Every structure is written in C-alpha cells, then in structure tokens.
Amino acid sequence: MQLIIVSGRSGSGKTIALRVLEDLGFYCVDNLPISLLPTLVHAVIEQYQKIAISIDVRNLPEHSEELLDSLSFLPKGVEPEILFIDSDDNTLLKRFGETRRLHPLSQKELPLLEALQAEHKMLEPIMERATWRLDSSDLSLHQLSEQVTERVLGRADKKLIIVFQSFGFKYGLPKDADFVFDARILPNPHWQPELKLLTGLDTDVQIFFRQEPLVTKFIYQLENFLDTWLPHFQRSNRSYLTIATGCTGGQHRSVYISQQLAERFEQKAVKVQVRHRELKTHG
C-alpha cells in the first residue's frame, strides 16, 4: 500500500494537492484526525492500494509523541510518505486577503500573521518528519499540481527524482532544498557587457564558463559528492532530492551549474528535473 499524508499551513495548497492525488487514483480523506489514521488504514487496506489523507493544524495531537504512536500502529509494511507544503508569510497573507477566508486559528482572536506563525510552530513535529517538501510561494495552481503529479508518478516506479534548482541569494534560499551550494565564488559573466543580459542557458555564457578551470573543478567536485551519497538517498524512503545552487541573481552561474549537473546525472540513468527559479520571476 502507498500512503501519503499531506500537511502544511493553511493557504499553502493542501487541498489542491489532495485533489491531484484523487485524480491519480488515491482514496482521499480530508482533515482526518491523526489518531484515527491507523483505524482508517486497517479498515481499507484490503480495498485500496493507494490512500492519501490531509492533516491540518486542527487535527494534530497536543503532544508530538501521539503523532509517533499513530504512525507506529499502522499495518506492517505500510511506510507513509509525508508531503509538507508551505509558503512564505507574505504569500499566505496575500492569499488570505484575496479569498477572505478565516484562518483555522482565528477563533483564538489572533491577528492573521500571528495565527500563521503559531500554526507553523504547531506543525513542526510533522514538518520535521516530512519525506518531501514543496514551497508553493512562487507556484501557480497549475505548477503546484504539476509538481505533485511528477513526484507521485516518479515515486510509483520507486525511482528517486533529483531536482537541480538554480536560485539567486538576493531573493532568499529555496525552502525545499536538501543541499545548498554557493556558486558566488566563481567568475561572473555579469561583468562582461556582451554577456550581462544573457543567462546560463545561452551558448556564449556556456563558452565563457567552459574556459574557466575553477568552474570545471566546482562541477567535478559536486558531481563526486553526489555520486558518493546518492545511493544512500536512493535506499531511503524519499521521493526526491533537491540540490539547489545559488549565485547572486540566479541568472548565470547557478543556472549553468544546475544544467551541467542535470545533464551528467541524466546520462547515468538518474531521473532528474531542472528548475531555474529566478528565470521565471526575475529573468
């Protein structure tokens, strides 16, 4: 049986994710109290091979030990995958302003920002046990649906998906990154007038980097690092591994490095995805 637990802060996209899972053939239950999880799974294990449930802040036990107890009472051989979806505070504030929905903690008469921050604190026990995370801050509904679909389908054939993501440090760290590498020490084509307005996807910029020994060494050592540890991640209960490489603005160095790593690991029959965060939003 495949069991996916979907959690995250209100407004982050849990409902969208659960709807996607339902379309993918999962038996879905929304807002199930975590204490009822073992009972539900035992009741339907003969009838359904794929189950997804969503858990929000109202369904969590008061003590984190109760969460562990609920997971330990699942049928033998059922290893839950926990998808935790979140967005930054500003994005969530904007979404609540647009929909005019009440936050689940609004009954405590907290201002919205304080309610969101309190919710984050309360969800920490399940967030810490997440096997995959999604930061939906910059994702449209379609993009969120697409990422959930890609990762679930990738998990169906038991293959770990490696996501190579480029980003700009000036715009903040990616929240869903498992490893972050800093490419700001590398030569920067931004200072070449003819390359400034191009990106790491352009041929002229790629030629510039191929002529830089430090860039070649950087890629070589990252590849060796991932070659060493990838087998260990493949044996764990994970759907994906996000490798984020950042430079100042996320246009040149990080884009080139991420592309190069993706191409190299694709040649090794590893399932990869590439995302260039700033090319979508600041390019």
From Swiss-Prot:
HAMAP family: RapZ_like. It comes from the Bacteria. Keywords: ATP-binding, GTP-binding, Nucleotide-binding. GO terms for molecular function: ATP binding; GTP binding. InterPro entries: P-loop_NTPase (IPR027417), RapZ-like (IPR005337), RapZ-like_N (IPR053930), RapZ_C (IPR053931). This is Nucleotide-binding protein IL0393. GTP binds at residues 56-59. Belongs to the RapZ-like family. The keyword ATP-binding applies. NCBIfam families: PRK05416.1 (NF003828). ATP binds at residues 8-15. Displays ATPase and GTPase activities. The lineage of its organism: Bacteria, Pseudomonadati, Pseudomonadota, Gammaproteobacteria, Alteromonadales.
